[in-house]
Amino acid sequence: MDRDSAQRLVALFGEEGVLALEQATVLVIGLGGVGSNCAEALARGGIGHLVLVDRDVVEPSNINRQAVAYTSTLGQDKTDVMERLVRDINPACRVDTVHSFITRDNLPELLAPYIGHLDYVVDAIDTMNQKVALARLAQDLGAEGLGFPLVSAMGGGNKLRPELLRFADITKTHTCPLCKDMRKLCRKRGVRHLEVLFSTEVPLQRVAGDASGTRSPLGTASFMPPIMGQMIAGHVICRITGVEGGRDGAPRRQRR
């Protein structure tokens, strides 16, 4: 990122912090409402290398919340749209895209080129089995000295209160239905710890389905998934720079 574009970052994180961001590699898996907005914020935050993983194309139902979704991008691969957006924001950012669906079986192979070089991984995956598989892989690689910091987004559907979002270990979560299922599956798969962003808000009740008995999809507010993505990006950036906000609002260097 050129110095003019980075001047507000330098004022907050200092030259050392901005250099750490420019040298960092962050992998974002899932470019939906959370992941696409997280990737955009990471690009604006000066991350030097982004790896973007998703297999979907932009659909009309994405427009209310996803950074990749415009009437002009309908039908296009989300990875392609996100890559163009990142390059337009920060031409100096190196972008790798992986147009693939993540499974328990292909996850090690897809991540293999980046293992040992990842400063952070953002899990914005929709499916629980893949989320836990990623957490288990991070744990197993960590035992070999090749692990990576991982933060996982929990459910933002049918929720309206971003002030109730919290970072916690999965074992300390409550209220969120996805977290309940994740805790159970983590125990089953031997995942001991997983940092997550979750909401303490009780989800709104779903609107009843039609006469055919089909359940309506989870509702999503235009602001909730993007705020979650922005919060995760902020969390990652603060961890990479070693700077956090003090109670008085002054930036403080974290102890390592």
Predicted feature residues:
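Conserved SAM/SAH-binding loop
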Residues: 98-107
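Glycine-rich phosphate-binding loop and adjoining beta1-alpha1-beta2 segment
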Residues: 47-90
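Conserved N-terminal Rossmann-fold NAD(P)-binding element of oxidoreductases
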Residues: 28-30, 53
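Hydrophobic/small residue at the entry helix of a nucleotide-binding pocket
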Residues: 34
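Short amphipathic alpha-helix with an adjacent loop that forms part of the alpha/beta core around
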Residues: 106-116
